[in-house]
Each structure stands twice: as structure tokens, then as C-alpha cells.
């Protein structure tokens, strides 16, 4: 009888702590074996999914409080009560709450939500200054002067852009912003359904313009979506201007949101048909001229290519725009 009475008092203390701090009880009802109810006085509504951000966050805060009271009472509290809040970005139905949740996490905490484990940190991506040591292209008359600082701000990387842990990756999108083929589809699949949900609110995007969203399950914090020109064959002057605008509009958003690193894919060179060599000239001119004005506001701009063909083009052309010797 004495033991049963002591257990009852301790359980009552835990229930009181959960009600004060909004914690769901470790059992569904007021006491084991009694009539069960679905929610506590201050907890989240019963209609909320267990994966819903509000439900998880409320549970996490309340559980911490219940655990603290349990320690003061000399009780070993139930392990699930002390678990941290977590949102499932694959199933949550509210992109706004998921976005707010992610913004409150540290970089280390965000890693738990990445779609991949083999992500690439920025510090692992060599700068052009380092890469150029292995480039044998000789440039008699470079288009621009040598600038050591700029050579440390630009990188050429061949690989999967969705795995780069940078502030933002740029998406070569179509005007609907709802996903498509190529890199666009890869980014949407990796980020998860919440990216498409947020993109639906942006109401399309014009050619040469850019819009920004959360990165969700990506290692990148943000995705900047831009729409390149469709140019099958020799591009016109207006199409070249639109391609340049894609990069500059994306960089404007980078500054606006105080982001310091970004990775760009090859925009318009896939199904949009822009010639790879001609695109590289536009891209390198835009990046060089932009960096000359804003080099202190960013840490790194990465040209991320997937095809060996594009890697060879940029390794050949970069010394003309970012000479190292």
C-alpha cells in the first residue's frame, strides 16, 4: 500500500508538470486504466499529426519541463519525455511552419534533416586559386587583371549540386517553378514536397528573373530559382542579356538575404538549348564584374557542373577571366 501510494503521488506530480507546460502525458488518459482523453489542457489539438511541427515543438518544450520536475522529485522520467522536438520534412503539410522550424536550428542541428549523408561542406571545395595549379592552359592576354582575392572567391566544382552545404544553390527552373527535368527535378526531389508547396505561392517567374525559397531537406539553406532563355542554335543578344540577368538577379537575392555562398548550375544549356561555350562566356563575365564590386560581401561563388564537357570548357575559360599567373 505504501509503495502504491508513493507511485500515485509521483505520477500526479508528472501530470501537473505536463499540464502547466503543455506536455502531452506519457499515457493517453488521466491515470493508467482510467477513461482516456486525447489532449491535455495546454497541449496541441488532437487533430495535429504526430509529425506536425506544432505538435512536435509543443511536445518537446513540455517534455523538457516534465523531465525537470521529475528530477526535482527524485524520479527517473520516461525517456520519450526528454526527446527533442523534430519535424519530418517528408510528411509535414505546412511549409511555413517547417521553414520557421529550420531557421531556428543551428547548422549542426540542420544536418539531421538533410536528405543525404554524403554532403559536401564548403571548406572541402577548392578555390579557383587552388584548382588553377593543375591547369596547364596558357593565356597570352587575359581579359581581366590578376586579383588574388577574387581567385579565392570563385570555385569550379564537378558533382551533384543538391549535396553542397552552402547558403544557397541556384535552380535552373522553368517558369512554373514547380519542378521539371534535369537539375530542376533533382533539386525538387531532394528538397522534398515542401519546396513545391512554397513554389506554388510564388506565382511563376519571368525569364531572367529569380525568386528564393527555403532549402528544406537540402544541405543548402536556400534555393534561388531562376528561369533561363530558350535558345536553340546561335543565341541572340537579347537571349545573352537574359542569361546574364539570371546570374545577376540571383546574386541580388544573395545580397538581399545576407547570404555569403552560392552554387550555380549551367543555366539554359540543357533542354533549353543554349550553346555551352557561349553560355560560359556570359557566366564568367557576369561573375567577374559582379565580384569586382561586391567581393567583400560574399565568401564563395561556385560554378557547379555535372558533365565532363562543361568542366573542360570552364577549366579552359576561367584563366581568361580569373588569371592566376
Swiss-Prot record:
The keyword Nucleus applies. There is a cross-link at residue 138 (Glycyl lysine isopeptide (Lys-Gly) (interchain with G-Cter in SUMO2)). Its EC number is 3.1.1.106, 3.2.2.-. The keyword Nucleus applies. It catalyses: 3''-O-acetyl-ADP-D-ribose + H2O = ADP-D-ribose + acetate + H(+); 2''-O-acetyl-ADP-D-ribose + H2O = ADP-D-ribose + acetate + H(+); 4-O-(ADP-D-ribosyl)-L-aspartyl-[protein] + H2O = L-aspartyl-[protein] + ADP-D-ribose + H(+); 5-O-(ADP-D-ribosyl)-L-glutamyl-[protein] + H2O = L-glutamyl-[protein] + ADP-D-ribose + H(+). The modification N6-succinyllysine is found at residues 96, 103, 129. Interacts with ESR1; Interacts in a manner that is estrogen independent but is enhanced by estrogen. Interacts (via macro domain) with AR. The gene is MACROD1. It is an enzyme of class 3 (hydrolase). It is found in: Nucleus. One of its GO terms (cellular component) is nucleoplasm. This is ADP-ribose glycohydrolase MACROD1. InterPro entries: Macro_dom, Macro_dom-like. Its main location: nucleus. Residues 21-55 are annotated as: Disordered. The modification N6-acetyllysine is found at residue 163.
Amino acid at each position: 500500500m505504501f509503495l502504491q501510494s508513493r507511485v500515485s503521488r509521483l505520477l500526479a506530480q508528472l501530470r501537473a508538470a505536463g499540464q502547466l507546460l503543455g506536455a502531452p502525458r506519457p499515457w493517453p488518459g488521466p491515470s493508467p486504466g482510467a477513461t482516456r482523453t486525447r489532449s491535455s489542457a495546454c497541449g496541441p489539438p488532437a487533430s495535429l499529426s504526430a509529425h506536425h511541427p506544432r505538435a512536435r515543438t509543443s511536445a518537446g518544450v513540455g517534455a523538457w519541463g516534465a523531465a525537470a520536475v521529475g528530477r526535482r522529485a527524485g524520479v527517473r522520467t520516461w525517456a520519450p519525455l526528454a526527446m527533442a522536438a523534430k519535424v519530418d520534412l517528408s510528411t509535414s503539410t505546412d511549409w511555413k511552419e517547417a521553414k520557421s522550424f529550420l531557421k531556428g536550428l543551428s547548422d549542426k542541428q540542420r544536418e539531421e534533416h538533410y536528405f543525404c549523408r554524403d554532403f559536401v561542406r564548403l571548406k572541402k571545395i577548392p578555390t579557383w586559386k587552388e584548382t588553377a595549379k593543375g591547369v596547364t592552359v596558357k593565356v597570352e592576354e587575359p581579359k581581366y587583371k590578376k586579383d588574388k582575392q577574387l581567385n579565392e572567391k570563385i570555385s569550379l566544382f564537378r558533382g551533384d549540386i543538391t549535396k553542397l552545404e552552402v547558403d544557397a544553390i541556384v535552380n535552373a527552373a522553368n517558369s512554373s517553378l514547380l519542378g521539371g527535368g534535369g537539375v530542376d527535378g533533382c533539386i525538387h526531389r531532394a528538397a522534398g514536397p515542401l519546396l513545391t508547396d512554397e513554389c506554388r505561392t510564388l506565382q511563376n517567374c519571368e525569364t531572367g528573373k529569380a525568386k528564393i525559397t527555403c532549402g528544406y531537406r537540402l544541405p543548402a539553406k536556400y534555393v534561388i530559382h531562376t528561369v533561363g532563355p530558350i535558345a536553340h542554335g546561335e543565341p541572340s543578344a537579347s537571349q545573352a542579356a537574359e542569361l546574364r540577368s539570371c546570374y545577376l538577379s540571383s546574386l541580388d537575392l544573395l545580397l538581399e538575404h545576407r547570404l555569403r555562398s552560392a552554387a550555380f548550375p549551367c543555366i539554359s544549356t540543357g533542354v533549353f538549348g543554349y550553346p555551352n561555350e557561349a553560355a560560359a562566356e556570359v557566366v564568367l563575365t557576369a561573375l567577374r564584374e559582379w565580384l569586382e564590386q561586391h567581393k567583400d560581401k560574399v565568401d564563395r561563388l561556385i560554378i557547379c557542373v555535372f558533365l565532363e564537357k562543361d568542366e573542360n570548357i570552364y577549366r579552359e575559360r576561367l584563366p581568361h577571366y580569373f588569371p592566376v599567373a
